[in-house]
């Protein structure tokens, strides 16, 4: 679902991962 509209599987073949590093420990905190 993009902007409230269904899309075709594979139409957007990528993902996003926001990550942070605190005191040398990397962690994922959000994605889309």
Swiss-Prot record:
GO terms assigned for molecular function: serine-type endopeptidase activity
Domain Peptidase S1: 1-32
One CC-aspect GO term: extracellular region
Pfam families cross-referenced by the UniProt entry: Trypsin
UniProt keyword annotations, A-Z: Hydrolase, Protease, Secreted, Serine protease
Localization of this protein: Secreted, Extracellular space
GO biological process: proteolysis
Listed EC numbers: 3.4.21.4
Function: High efficiency toward native protein substrates including collagens.
The family this protein is said to belong to: Belongs to the peptidase S1 family.
Protein name as annotated: Trypsin
Biological source species: Penaeus monodon (Giant tiger prawn)
Native organism taxonomy: Eukaryota, Metazoa, Ecdysozoa, Arthropoda, Crustacea
